[in-house]
C-alpha cells in the first residue's frame, strides 16, 4: 500500500511539474506578444493660401518600444546617405525641408510618432503638391528594430506601400 501511495505521489508531482513548465512557456509567449512594436509610415499633406506642406511620419502603433538597430534610406532603389538621398529626390525643395534621422539604439516608445521629413513649398494648385509627393515617393526606408525581447523585425517601405 505504501508503494502505491509513493507512486501516486510521484505521478502527481510529475504532472504538476509538467503543467508548471507548460504554463511558463505559455506565459513567456504571451509576454513577448504584449511588448511587440509595430512601425509604419504615413504621409500628411495640407495646402493653405498657396503654401503647402508634406510630411512623412513614422509611428510605433505596437504594444512596446521599438529599439532601432538600423535606419537606411534608399533613393531610386540605391542605398544612400539620408541627406544625399533627400537632396537628390527633392532638388531645390530640399532646402525647405526638415528631416529626422533615427540613430541606432534609439528607443521609440509605444504610440510615439516622429516626423521623418517635412517639406514646405509654395503651391498654387494640387498638381504642384502631387509633383512633390511623387519626388518623395522615390525615397524608400528600411528600419531594422527589435522589441524588449530582442526579436528583430524589419520595416521596409517598399513592401508596405
Residue ranges and their predicted role:
Residues 1-69, 73-80:
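Membrane-proximal alpha-helical anchors
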Residues 3, 48-49, 67-69, 74-161:
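An amphipathic alpha-helical interaction surface
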Amino acid at each position: 500500500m505504501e508503494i502505491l501511495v509513493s507512486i501516486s505521489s510521484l505521478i502527481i508531482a510529475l504532472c504538476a511539474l509538467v503543467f508548471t513548465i507548460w504554463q511558463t512557456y505559455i506565459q513567456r509567449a504571451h509576454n513577448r506578444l504584449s511588448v511587440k512594436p509595430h512601425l509604419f509610415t504615413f504621409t500628411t499633406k495640407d495646402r493653405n493660401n498657396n503654401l503647402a506642406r508634406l510630411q512623412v511620419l513614422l509611428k510605433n502603433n505596437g504594444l512596446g518600444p521599438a529599439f532601432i538597430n538600423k535606419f537606411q534610406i534608399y533613393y531610386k532603389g540605391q542605398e544612400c546617405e539620408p541627406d544625399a538621398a533627400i537632396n537628390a529626390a527633392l532638388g531645390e525643395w530640399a532646402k525647405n525641408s526638415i528631416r529626422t534621422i533615427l540613430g541606432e539604439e534609439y528607443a521609440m516608445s509605444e504610440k510615439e510618432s516622429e516626423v521623418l521629413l517635412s517639406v514646405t513649398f509654395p503651391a498654387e494648385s494640387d498638381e504642384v503638391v502631387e509633383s512633390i509627393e511623387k519626388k518623395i515617393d522615390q525615397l524608400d526606408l528600411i528600419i531594422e528594430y527589435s522589441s524588449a525581447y530582442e526579436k528583430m523585425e524589419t520595416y521596409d517601405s517598399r513592401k508596405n506601400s
